[in-house]
Design a protein with these regions (language model features):
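N-terminal Rossmann NAD(P)H-binding glycine-rich loop of SDR-like oxidoreductase domains
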Residues: 4-26
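Conserved Rossmann-fold NAD(P)-dependent oxidoreductase catalytic core, especially the SDR/UDP-sugar
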Residues: 92-150
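Conserved beta-loop-beta element that borders a ligand/cofactor-binding pocket
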Residues: 109, 161-173
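Conserved internal alpha-helix in NAD(P)-dependent oxidoreductase domains
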Residues: 80, 84-91, 99, 103, ...
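Active-site helix of classical SDR
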Residues: 152-159
Length: 173
């Protein structure tokens, strides 16, 4: 039985490097990055830029799943830094996936999409290891926690979650 074709953007990054061994066992793995990915067969080592829609379309052809991890991950980035890769690039990923018939896009979000909640109690005290001021039990953060980004990087991750929802609901990805 043939393996599902899975392409990962940002395979050389921290998360990509961590998942690569398992993904190589289970899937026919491809990568997409600006500089290429170490030790990846050339036909599955797609070089391009998230801002370049056409390079994404070329890479996504015949892929079953795209795992989107590539981003500018600077927590202190300003809007002009985040916009090209984390906003425009992300939309390009989803649109290319739609056009190419990709069945699933997995978006790598971040706790920074809700990180502004750490400014409020009880989370502030927990983060400062000041447990004497924490009333137990308290509600843990989960998928129902209010979106409250901590900086423009967090905004871009919250945006990515919303874009993923749109493409899931209206395009079946």
């Amino acid at each position: 039985m043939s393996k599902k074709k899975v392409l990962v953007t940002g395979l050389n990054g921290v998360v990509g490097s961590a998942i690569r061994p398992l993904f190589e066992e289970k899937y026919e793995l491809s990568s997409f990055s600006r500089y290429g990915c170490d030790d990846m067969p050339e036909e599955r080592n797609h070089k391009g830029d998230l801002k370049d829609y056409d390079s994404l379309v070329k890479a996504f052809k015949d892929q079953h799943t795209v795992v989107h991890l590539a981003a500018d991950r600077s927590m202190r980035a300003d809007w002009d830094t985040v916009l090209p890769y984390n906003i425009i690039g992300l939309r390009n990923v989803y649109e290319a996936a739609k056009v190419c018939g990709v069945k699933r896009v997995v978006f790598g979000s971040s706790q920074h999409s809700i990180g502004g909640n750490y400014d409020d109690e009880p989370y502030k005290s927990v983060m400062e290891s000041d447990f004497e001021n924490v009333e137990y039990p308290f509600k843990r953060m989960d998928e129902t926690t209010r979106i409250r980004p901590s900086g423009w990087y967090g905004v871009s991750k919250a945006f990515g979650e919303a874009v993923g929802s749109i493409y899931s609901q209206y395009h079946g990805i």
